[in-house]
A protein has these predicted regions:
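Short amphipathic alpha-helical segments, especially helix-boundary/capping motifs
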Residues: 26-27, 122
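A glycine- and Lys/Arg-enriched "phosphate-lid" helix/loop adjacent to the NTP-binding pocket
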Residues: 1-26
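Short, well-ordered coil/turn elements that cap or connect secondary structure elements
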Residues: 28-30, 206
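Long, hydrophilic "mature protein body" segments
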Residues: 21, 30, 36-37, 61-62, ...
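Phosphate-binding beta-loop-alpha motif at adenosine-nucleotide cofactor sites
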Residues: 30-48
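Phosphate-end processing signature that detects enzymes handling 5′-triphosphorylated RNA
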Residues: 43, 51-222
């Protein structure tokens, strides 16, 4: 965060990197993590930060590109060792429609010994554009929402491994119903997509409806 109270930093490059790594590690479990890198000028960094905020609150804004890949099951322990990946256990439940233009879901997320709960709503406009809003909720509200669950869909359990390399953010979703495959998400600006070493990509599934979360809730397979 930028403010006028920060002291000047005079540490070596190595120490600066160590501090930045610790900061990223501390925030890596946050459900709305965005990495604003130093590859652009200060003004562009501010613009990227503003765009990230708009994205989080569900307002139309230029969003980072998002690519999705079907991958061979990675060595999750190696992800932690090699990339300092943070593992987050999640359970996502889709709710019955009350508005045909609004998809609703709730998520239970385990952070260490604590559980967090979120309500998410994805709305689609008549022009085809959509935005997503998400807010934290109490355990009591979460349980109440579960009573509105879509009975035609399964709850989706997964462990999400989050890490960053350079200006890009990576997420790997591992599901209990698949022992051989997982899903890799790559977030970042630009068309070129650098994939982490040690990850075997089977194919890109960015626009494949079969690998959307709602489809996985229906078929429970990769």
């Amino acid at each position: 965060a930028y403010n006028y109270g920060n002291a000047a930093r005079y540490e070596s490059v190595e120490v600066a990197r160590e501090k930045d790594d610790k900061t990223l590690r501390a925030w890596s479990r946050h459900p709305a993590l965005h990495v604003i890198d130093n590859s652009v000028n200060f003004e562009e960094k501010i613009n990227r930060g503003i765009a990230a905020i708009f994205s989080i609150i569900g307002q139309p804004a230029p969003a980072q590109s998002k690519r999705k890949y079907l991958i061979a099951m990675p060595d999750t322990e190696e992800l932690v060792r090699r990339y300092n990946a943070a593992a987050v256990e999640m359970m996502q439940t889709y709710l019955a429609y009350t508005n045909p233009q609004a998809e609703r879901r709730v998520r239970q997320q385990r952070n260490g010994s604590e559980y967090l709960y979120f309500y998410t709503e994805k709305r689609t406009n008549s022009d085809g554009t959509c935005w997503v809003t998400e807010r934290p909720i109490s355990e009591k509200d979460y349980i109440a929402y579960l009573m509105e669950g879509d009975s035609s869909l399964h709850a989706v359990r997964k462990t999400k491994y989050r890490f960053a390399l350079g200006s890009r953010r990576y997420e790997i979703d591992v599901y209990p119903f698949s022992t051989e495959r997982a899903i890799l998400f790559v977030y970042g600006d630009g068309a070129d997509c650098e994939l982490p070493e040690g990850i075997e990509v089977l194919r890109e599934v960015t626009d494949d409806m079969e690998y959307k979360n709602r489809s996985l809730a229906r078929v429970q397979r990769l």
